[in-house]
Amino acid sequence: MFSLNKNNKTKNILSLILYCFLVISLFAHFFYCIGKVPPSHYVSKNNILSAVSASANIFNINSNTTLNENISVYEEKLTKFISSAFNERNNSFLNGSVYKLYNYYGTSDANAKYSLDYEFKRIAYLRDWSLERSIIFTSINSLVIINKVTKNNNKIIVNLDEYYNFNYIHNKQFASNKFSFTIPHILTLYSYTNDLGEECFIIDKDYYSDVFNDELNDYNFYLTETSLPYTKKINPNYKVSEQFNKNDIIRFDKSLFTDHKAIISGYDSNGYPLIDSNSFNISNMPFDLGWKEKNIKLSY
């Protein structure tokens, strides 16, 4: 029995030695072969990563180019529709006619009704404000810059900036005045296909902060109106505020809080105080446009 165990142990030792010799021989052969390969035949890790990166970039360029082209074409359609809607509203500022605005809003929906009603209030207010001061708007234009488009089926959310430009004169004067401001919008639209198979859009919600919002609560509409009449008359004795001087800092208060501040930048052709403000990027705007004068105060 003892002799048998001794023989098995000897065999195991020999097998282990043989296995180790085989492994060492394989490694030696491997490194010998590597040493025979010229350096120019090596492929570095950097070259491999560069090749992979180049392939990925080619794919991204192709896919992004296609995607950007699709987005660009779609944004052009949206920009055309939104610009048309905004400039139709601007025409309503000038002439009071609002019947064409119904074509841009889905008036069967509560959100769209609210949005259209708000535009009616803005139109009525601006017309009354200008008439009372004997101001005549000669042109109002909007430039639409789309920042982002999010599409989910036929629902489209557009983040955009609207750049307003107003030109006006005072009654019985020829000198032209102009001012501008910017309003950021979050606009929700829905797309649909008309009878001709063309894609069309309708406005559902239009959320934005507004320079006019302090003076709109006096107006109510039924959304059956086709034109908005004046509710005020020309005041030939309208007294221009004399409490503010150039470079004064003024604040616009809402309830117990200051909404924003502005600087008196100068005066228009009739001596009307104008303001500049970082809020809405306001430039040379009549100081009380959109605000009750009692809420406009010097900021000490």
Residue ranges and their predicted role:
Residues 5-22:
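N-terminal Sec-pathway targeting helices
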Residues 28-46:
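Sec-dependent signal peptide cleavage junction
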Residues 48-140, 234-236:
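Core segments of small alpha/beta cavity-forming domains
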Residues 124-176:
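Surface-exposed, charged secondary-structure patches
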Residues 146-159, 188-200, 266-271:
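A short, structured loop/turn motif at beta-sheet edges
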Residues 170-239:
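Low-complexity, intrinsically disordered terminal/linker segments enriched in charged
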Residues 243-245:
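Short, well-ordered loop/turn sites that connect or cap secondary structure elements
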Residues 265-300:
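Aromatic- and glycine-rich peptidoglycan recognition patches
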